[in-house]
From Swiss-Prot:
Subcellular locations according to the entry: Cytoplasm
Enzyme class of the recorded protein, top EC level: transferase
Protein name: S-adenosylmethionine:tRNA ribosyltransferase-isomerase
Protein EC: 2.4.99.17
Cited SUPFAM superfamilies: QueA-like
Gene of this entry: queA
Catalytic activity: 7-aminomethyl-7-carbaguanosine(34) in tRNA + S-adenosyl-L-methionine = epoxyqueuosine(34) in tRNA + adenine + L-methionine + 2 H(+)
Xref: PANTHER family: S-ADENOSYLMETHIONINE:TRNA RIBOSYLTRANSFERASE-ISOMERASE
One GO-annotated biological process of the protein: tRNA wobble guanine modification
Major subcellular site: cytoplasm
Length: 360
């Protein structure tokens, strides 16, 4: 499909720079193809679900992936800004670096603002290789848990570019940019639909007989990358690591066999569930990488309802929601959201999407 079909104009003032407080006071646009839209709040979510429905959340935890430092060992020592994007092994990460032109293979970058050091000393990273568009492979001076602790001490919250370009990260973001489910460290971007949840709404959902299950997908920075090709067929999707336990897969399959619906909280949960489902819609245990790219025409096998935020134009995520609820439906829903003052992107409001009906 042509990527310009997924374009739309978004006023700059629609981008949320802080989350709603309390989290479940965010607005929620309910989209039912063929039945229009309804303006609600996230706290209304239990009313839209039935006993036996199963919510699936992503329990990944965002690491302090934004690092600053200087190149050392040559005459000039330019400042280097790096965002970790994917762990390769116990001591190596892929990172997006600015300015990448200042680095070559073999260079050493000493990380930490103004000579700041971590508990083990300096954190040095050797440039192992350079890729396209500012991507480099770093080989760090520490390994395993020691490297993780050094990154946690020296790094900061990796805010999305549409927020970071307008303000610097601060102490509030360290908690605001984590979901209440965040457990397994490894993401460099939050699974933002989960940011809307509070203990109160979890209690209300359980009281209604809705189950809640955790899966893990370590969200990468590729989630923010625009689709630069003219046709979706030419786009190379980023891969991310995920896991679904046998216990969770069995529980979801059993609930669905009894008539319960699977409600994916976020596109990350949906992508992992769809990656793990067979042709009959049964979810299999899963551990590994997924690079699933969902566009209109995809047959959804594992997910019945999707709760998600509002996404960027021409993004793979807007393509995904258009596949789920229909392109024209989503364009109309987004036009309504913009005119009604909904807040967009990571810290913004939510949508509750129902699927496009077959033959619609």
């Amino acid at each position: 499909m042509r990527t310009d079909l997924f374009d739309f104009e978004l006023p700059a003032g629609s981008i949320a720079l802080r989350p709603a407080s309390p989290r479940d006071s965010a607005r929620m646009l309910v989209v039912q193809p063929g039945s229009g839209v309804r303006d609600q709040q996230v706290s209304d979510l239990p009313e839209w679900l039935r006993p036996g429905d199963q919510l699936v959340v992503n329990d990944t935890r965002v690491i302090a992936a934004q690092l600053h430092g200087r190149r050392i060992g040559r005459e000039a020592e330019p400042r280097i800004d790096a965002t970790l994007i994917k762990r390769l092994d116990g001591s190596r990460w892929s990172a997006l670096v600015r300015p990448a032109r200042k680095l070559m293979a073999g260079d050493i970058v000493r990380l930490g603002n103004e000579g700041r050091v971590c508990f083990l000393g300096h954190l040095d990273a050797r440039v192992e290789s350079k890729g396209e568009e500012g991507e480099v492979t770093f080989a760090f001076s520490f390994h395993g848990p020691m490297l993780d602790q050094a990154i946690a001490e020296l790094g900061s919250t990796p805010l999305p570019p549409y927020i970071a370009s307008k303000r610097a990260p601060d102490d509030r973001d360290a908690s605001d940019y984590q979901t209440m489910f965040a457990t397994h460290e490894g993401a460099v971007a939050a699974p933002t639909a989960g940011l809307h949840f509070t203990p109160e709404i979890e209690t209300a959902l359980r009281g209604r007989g809705v189950g809640l299950h955790r899966i893990t997908l370590h969200v990468g920075a590729g989630t923010f990358l625009p689709v630069k090709v003219d046709d979706t067929a030419g786009h190379r999707m980023h891969s991310e690591w995920g896991a679904i336990s046998t216990e969770t897969a069995d529980a979801l399959n059993a609930a669905r066999s009894r008539g319960g619906r699977i409600v994916a909280v976020g596109t990350t949960s949906l992508r992992l569930l769809e990656s793990a489902a067979d042709d009959d819609g049964r979810i299999k245990p899963f551990t590994g990488e997924t690079a699933i790219f969902i566009t209109p025409g995809h047959r959804f096998r594992a997910v019945d309802i999707l709760m998600t935020n509002f996404h960027l134009p021409r993004s793979t995520l807007f393509m995904l929601v258009s596949a789920f609820s229909g392109l024209e439906t989503m364009k109309q829903a987004y036009a309504h959201a913009i005119s009604a003052g909904y807040r967009f992107y990571s810290y913004g409001d939510a949508c509750l999407l129902f699927p496009e009906r077959a033959g619609a």
